[in-house]
Design a protein with these regions (language model features):
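Proline-rich low-complexity regions
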Residues: 38, 74, 90, 136-137
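HotDog/MaoC-like acyl-thioester-processing domains
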Residues: 1-14, 92-138
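Hot-dog-fold acyl-thioester-processing enzymes
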Residues: 1-78
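Charge-rich, low-complexity amphipathic helices
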Residues: 51-55, 68, 86-87, 91, ...
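Mid-chain, well-packed structural core segment of small domains
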Residues: 71-95, 99
Length: 138
């Protein structure tokens, strides 16, 4: 876990990590949220909707923004204030995602950083685009 302070974070600073979406993660997310939409766990339904496989929950992919802020950038000293997320392409169970955050702005007065987030799949396709405003505790 990183412990960057506000003064250690410059515009352009980047951090990234990689995860693979497993069936177990999908099932835990479904149990946690109660979202039983068949697109996520009924292959015949997913195929009828034009997908080759069951679609992973979009918010499961988006939940990795919390990991990005809380573990990597800035890490321990973070408190997310605002998020924006755009889902660009479906994510499927078995996909390997690379989550990258880059600092695009700093607010010295309020000790806030703005982080642009891109999530790409194993084919390099951008599946999620987002932005976070994060307070950095001292």
């Amino acid at each position: 876990m990183n412990t960057y302070t506000f003064d250690e974070i410059d515009i352009g600073k980047k951090e990234s990590f990689t995860v693979t979406i497993s069936e177990e993660e999908r099932d835990k997310f479904r149990e946690l949220t109660g979202d039983v939409n068949p697109l996520h766990n009924d292959l015949s339904y997913a195929k009828a909707m034009g997908h080759d496989r069951c679609v992973a929950f979009g918010m499961l992919s988006a939940s990795y923004l919390s990991t990005l802020a809380g573990v990597y950038l800035p890490g321990k000293n973070s408190l997310i204030q605002k998020t924006e997320v755009n889902f660009r392409k479906p994510v499927y169970v078995g996909d390997t995602l690379t989550i990258t955050g880059e600092v695009t702005d700093r607010n010295e007065t309020f000790k806030l950083i703005e982080v642009k987030v891109d999530i790409k799949n194993q084919n390099g396709e951008k599946v999620v685009k987002g932005k976070m405003e994060i307070a950095v505790a001292e």
